Amino acid sequence: MRISLKKSGMLKLGLSLVAMTVAASVQAKTLVYCSEGSPEGFNPQLFTSGTTYDASSVPLYNRLVEFKIGTTEVIPGLAEKWEVSEDGKTYTFHLRKGVKWHDNKEFKPTRELNADDVVFSFDRQKNAQNPYHKVSGGSYEYFEGMGLPELISEVKKVDDNTVQFVLTRPEAPFLADLAMDFASILSKEYADAMMKAGTPEKLDLNPIGTGPFQLQQYQKDSRIRYKAFDGYWGTKPQIDTLVFSITPDASVRYAKLQKNECQVMPYPNPADIARMKQDKSINLMEMPGLNVGYLSYNVQKNHLMT
């Protein structure tokens, strides 16, 4: 993956979009990111595209555990510590205290994060009887594709600040699984309020999370505007406003970058790479992707084998 950055006194950026929350200089007030497209929604449980994750799970939500930026090392997130049973089948997570939720025009939280939110976030994906399971299409491709409905026997609340995952078998990468975008934690209190109001889909369209930014405005195919969340439990953002300027054409993204209309752009055209490297005002960053692409034979059709 390649990310291009406009060098200026207002911006310092690490290896991923997450770094925007911690690496901008103190002088920076607004950071504009030329996104490559509109998100499919704002609930990362329901989608699989990186474009959607960049706009939802990264700025808006947290997970029990996280990946250390630029690595696959698992570090504490909403869970400050955890234990694994000797048989490798029970994971006990101890939640951080004092983690606050965003709010919006329709909902004001009355409590902080607790174990009910964690249980709800996974039960929605696993349990076909959960009232939210079929809301917004009810497609949980990552959760189901990774075999988690069969792996996770139970997610249970021990107390307000402790939650347990009971597995059907030991699973070495389970912690890393919980650091992925689809494992973002949503508010059960907000979900209950929207269900009671008869508008459950708003949970997925008007997001409320615990992340460093909260959603202010979304204009499809135009822009997304976020503001720094004053109550964020982690390292405070060093910018006040984050704007996604939705720009599908890579050439247009590059032109905006050159004019400083945006300070960050992903996925430049390969033909532009050489020019970018020669431009001292642009910092071109490269990092290996985690996805693997391949071609395979279709062995399900007999006539293709003759």
Residue ranges and their predicted role:
Residues 69-70, 90, 96-132, 201-207, ...:
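Extracytoplasmic/periplasmic ligand-capture domains
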Residues 34-86, 123, 208-210:
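N-terminal lobe/hinge region of extracytoplasmic solute-binding protein
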Residues 53, 79-83, 152-155, 211-215, ...:
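A structural signal for short loop-to-beta-strand junctions that line the ligand-binding cleft
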Residues 26-28:
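Boundary at the C-terminal end of the N-terminal hydrophobic targeting segment
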Residues 2-14:
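Bacterial N-terminal signal peptides that target proteins for export
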Residues 127, 131-191:
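Surface-exposed binding/hinge segments that line
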Residues 38-54, 78, 105-108, 174-184, ...:
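A structural "hinge/loop" feature
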